[in-house]
């Protein structure tokens, strides 16, 4: 009896591990790399079979068997390959918990985007490069910026790389250039020329509204601080040695309010010598500083820059101020200035510093 071959409804011999259910669907039973039984299904035994009417089309059982046998021979985790993209991304994130709040929020945004997209529920071993590209196109159609999509793609590429290292899949579907799929419409960094910088400052110095921000913009241009580092400055400044100690950022979140973060990079903690122009600006800022509300954030108090309520200013305050400043300047001048953000002052500072460094090296 043991030599009797099992047959399907079409009188075809079935191989070891193969069977056919009463509803006509074929089943293949195998043992995964962990020694646990697994099952795969298909309405077709071989590629030439037709899928029954009303049933979802799929590759045949024999094709699935061949792939599984190849995966098992190569040590591929066929079960791990069935985790969804959302599960993979969550697993990747679970391996690095000590992150900044902004990074945590960024992870939440991407996870929500995945949950609201067909890609998120796909098994990772079914995701092809064409699927990843279609995801990028859908994200663009939903209104996501190119840089955001590129950042999300980078995170997913890292997640799929982990899956490759864990022998769950063979290839990384996110191994492609986004610019081959979407047009890079990212606006280039705006850098003020020395002449534009002087025109802007001259306008601010005389303007009734924006003159009160003059010293703050001078300090941004002279130090190149990130705006969150700038907002984190306190009145405890080493004026005797003319040094700014940068060791934290001040940010504000709609959920938790003000909070302190370490600098963005490992080299972010630094001592910054003050130029004479910056030193004079700080002296005026300290002299004209209004009354502060009693507030301690992460052990820091006496923040240097205050809003009209006596609370620390944050990035949003300066973003709005700069927009209004440029709009008003361009309204009364034919020689228009480009639209800038507070971060543009940092770009300008870095460019000027690099130019001076190159000039010094040439002289040497």
Per-region residue spans from a language model:
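Short N-terminal "domain-start" leader segments
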Residues: 2-23
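N-terminal DNA-binding module of tyrosine recombinases/phage integrases
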Residues: 21-26, 32-133, 287-299
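C-terminal catalytic core of Y-nucleophile DNA break-rejoin enzymes
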Residues: 40, 260-284, 300-324, 341
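N-terminal core-binding DNA-recognition domain of tyrosine site-specific recombinases/integrases
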Residues: 53-57, 93-168, 186, 208-209, ...
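Basic, Lys/Arg- and aromatic-enriched nucleic-acid-binding interface segment
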Residues: 152, 165, 169-171, 175-227, ...
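Conserved tyrosine-mediated DNA breakage-rejoining catalytic core shared by Y-recombinases
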Residues: 232-290
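Short beta-strand/loop motif that positions the catalytic acidic residue
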Residues: 352
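Conserved small/polar residues in nucleotide/adenosyl-binding loops
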Residues: 355-364
């Amino acid at each position: 009896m043991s030599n009797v071959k099992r047959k399907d409804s079409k009188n075809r011999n079935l191989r070891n591990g193969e069977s056919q259910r009463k509803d006509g669907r074929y089943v293949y039973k195998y043992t995964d790399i962990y020694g646990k039984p697994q099952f795969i299904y298909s309405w077709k035994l071989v590629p030439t079979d037709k899928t029954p009417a009303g049933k979802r089309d799929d590759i045949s059982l024999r094709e699935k068997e061949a792939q599984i046998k190849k995966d098992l021979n190569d040590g591929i985790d066929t079960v791990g390959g069935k985790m969804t993209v959302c599960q993979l991304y969550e697993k990747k994130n679970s391996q690095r918990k000590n992150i900044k709040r902004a990074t945590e929020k960024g992870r939440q945004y991407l996870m929500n985007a995945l949950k609201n997209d067909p890609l998120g529920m796909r098994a990772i071993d079914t995701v092809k490069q064409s699927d990843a590209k279609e995801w990028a196109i859908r994200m663009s159609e939903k209104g996501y910026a190119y840089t955001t999509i590129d950042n999300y793609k980078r995170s997913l590429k890292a997640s799929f790389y982990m899956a490759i290292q864990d022998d769950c899949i063979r290839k990384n579907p996110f191994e492609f250039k986004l610019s081959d799929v979407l047009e890079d419409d990212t606006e280039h960094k705006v850098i003020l020329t020395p002449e534009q910088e002087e025109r802007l400052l001259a306008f601010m110095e005389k303007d009734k509204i924006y003159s009160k921000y003059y010293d703050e913009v001078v300090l941004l241009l002279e130090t190149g601080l990130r705006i969150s580092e700038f907002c984190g400055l306190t009145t405890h400044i080493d004026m005797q040695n003319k040094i700014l100690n940068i060791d934290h950022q001040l940010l504000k979140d709609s959920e938790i309010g003000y909070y302190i973060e370490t600098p963005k990079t490992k080299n972010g903690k630094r001592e910054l010598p003050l130029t004479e122009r910056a030193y004079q600006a700080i002296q005026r800022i300290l002299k004209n500083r209004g009354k502060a509300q009693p507030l301690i954030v992460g052990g820091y108090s006496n923040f240097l820059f205050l809003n009209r309520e006596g609370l620390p200013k944050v990035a949003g305050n300066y973003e709005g101020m700069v927009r209004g400043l440029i709009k008003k300047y361009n309204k009364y001048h034919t020689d228009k200035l480009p639209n800038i953000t507070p971060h543009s002052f940092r770009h300008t500072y870095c460019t000027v510093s690099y130019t001076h460094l190159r000039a010094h090296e040439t002289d040497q």
